[in-house]
Every structure is written in structure tokens, then in C-alpha cells.
């Protein structure tokens, strides 16, 4: 099954986040949350995180871009276990990085979830919408 869709949520007073049920059913109760690109967070299963980081670290250790990307993704990462209601506590360093104060949005992107502050997501969505056909035409040359 694919992680798809957009779900709005709110941070609780105790800084807990509830993962949407449809996402929990796919990703499970143990996951990794880390810094994402463009000011959001990335939520993935432990297995998916291992696959992503293996793809990055297969390069040469002497390459600064590889080391910096590894620092960015692994240095900010935390393992989380969901409680019986599908919630976990989001550490303050990740809340600060993503600018999440209260309202947030989960966005399913096939193999991972992005977690955005509602304001940042609304702005990003406008930006994408206004350039969607241009972006899609550039992707014609990109291969998996």
C-alpha cells in the first residue's frame, strides 16, 4: 500500500502528535522522524530509513556533501514508538526545525510521510500549484 493523501492535525499540550490511522496501518508502530528538506519533517518506517540512509552513505566518506547529508538526516533523527492511540512525543529540536507550533499537516509521499507546519505547507502547496506544469515538464528527463 502507498502512503498518500493530506491530513491536518494539531499538536497537543504535551507536544504529542497523532499519526493518521491510514498511515499507521501502513507504516506500523515504530518509526523514525528526522529533518526533511524544505523545512518539513520526514516520517518513515525503520526499514525505509535504513534503505534511504544506505543509499546516501554508499558514496565516498571523503565527499563533504555525503557527510553533510548524512549529518542532516541521521543527526536530527529520533526513533519513536506509538502509544495505543497512535501518538508520540515530538522532540523540541524537530518542532523548532519544522516551525510546528500547533497546526500541522501530514502529507503521504508513497514511501514516506512529510510533516509540515500548516502555514509552511499552505505556502509550499501554492508554490507547487502555480508551477505544476513547468515542474512536470522538467521531470520528463528524470529517471528512477
Model-derived segments and their meaning:
Residues 1-9, 13-14, 22-80, 84, ...:
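Flexible "stalk/tail and boundary" regions
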Amino acid at each position: 500500500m502507498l502512503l498518500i493523501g493530506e491530513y491536518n492535525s494539531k499538536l497537543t499540550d504535551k507536544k504529542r502528535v497523532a499519526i493518521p490511522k491510514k498511515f499507521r496501518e501502513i507504516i506500523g508502530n515504530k518509526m523514525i522522524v528526522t529533518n526533511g528538506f524544505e523545512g518539513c519533517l520526514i516520517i518513515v518506517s525503520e526499514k525505509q530509513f535504513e534503505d534511504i540512509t544506505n543509499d546516501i552513505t554508499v558514496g565516498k566518506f571523503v565527499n563533504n556533501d555525503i557527510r553533510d547529508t548524512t549529518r542532516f538526516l541521521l543527526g536530527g533523527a529520533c526513533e519513536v514508538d506509538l502509544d495505543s492511540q497512535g501518538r508520540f512525543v515530538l522532540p523540541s529540536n524537530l518542532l523548532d526545525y519544522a516551525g510546528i507550533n500547533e497546526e500541522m499537516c501530514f502529507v503521504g509521499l508513497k514511501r514516506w510521510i512529510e510533516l509540515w507546519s500548516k502555514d509552511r505547507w499552505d505556502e509550499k502547496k501554492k508554490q507547487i500549484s502555480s508551477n505544476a506544469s513547468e515542474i512536470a515538464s522538467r521531470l520528463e528527463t528524470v529517471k528512477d
